[in-house]
């Protein structure tokens, strides 16, 4: 394993640990999820470039599209909870159920 892949794996693990530690606050969780998606995107892109897999070069782009959708839904939930309750605690998300 090269140093770059080790650093990206370490960045993913730190972001995963951040999701676990800051799971009460939605904003911190969203930032950690974005860090995880960014490290996965870079790892997938570098792996595809390293192995010269030109037929699968659309996978990183698809991953970015899903990451943008995840960020949009997360920010919509953040705006809804902060406008309704004045805080970004995830415990308030149970109150949004129909």
From Swiss-Prot:
What's the name of the protein?
NADH-ubiquinone oxidoreductase chain 4L
> What does the UniProt entry say about where the protein is found?
Mitochondrion inner membrane
Please report the record's description of how this protein sits within the membrane: Multi-pass membrane protein
Which terms are listed as keywords in the entry? Electron transport, Membrane, Mitochondrion, Mitochondrion inner membrane, NAD, Respiratory chain, Translocase, Transmembrane, Transmembrane helix, Transport, Ubiquinone
Supply one GO CC term from the record: mitochondrial inner membrane
Function, please? Core subunit of the mitochondrial membrane respiratory chain NADH dehydrogenase (Complex I) which catalyzes electron transfer from NADH through the respiratory chain, using ubiquinone as an electron acceptor. Part of the enzyme membrane arm which is embedded in the lipid bilayer and involved in proton translocation.
- Chain segments annotated as transmembrane: 1-21, 29-49, 59-79
Q: How does it assemble?
A: Core subunit of respiratory chain NADH dehydrogenase (Complex I) which is composed of 45 different subunits.
One GO MF term: NADH dehydrogenase (ubiquinone) activity
Taxonomically, the superkingdom here is Eukaryota
Name the Gene Ontology biological process terms: ATP synthesis coupled electron transport
What does the record give as the reaction this protein catalyses?
a ubiquinone + NADH + 5 H(+)(in) = a ubiquinol + NAD(+) + 4 H(+)(out)
Protein EC: 7.1.1.2
Where does the UniProt entry say this protein principally localizes? Answer: mitochondrion
Using the UniProt record, name the top-level EC class of this enzyme in a single word: translocase
Q: Which Pfam families match?
A: Oxidored_q2
What the record says about family reads: Belongs to the complex I subunit 4L family.
Task: Check the record and name the Gene3D superfamilies matching this protein.
Answer: 1.10.287.3510
């Amino acid at each position: 394993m090269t140093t770059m892949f080790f650093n990206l794996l370490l960045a993913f693990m730190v972001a995963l640990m951040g999701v676990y530690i800051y799971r009460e606050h939605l904003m911190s969780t969203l930032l950690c999820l974005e860090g995880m998606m960014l490290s996965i995107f870079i790892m997938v892109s570098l792996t595809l470039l390293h192995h010269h897999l030109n037929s699968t070069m659309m996978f990183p782009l698809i991953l970015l599209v899903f990451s943008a959708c995840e960020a949009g839904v997360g920010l919509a939930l953040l705006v809804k909870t902060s406008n309704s309750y004045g805080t970004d605690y995830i415990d308030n998300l149970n109150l949004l159920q129909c």
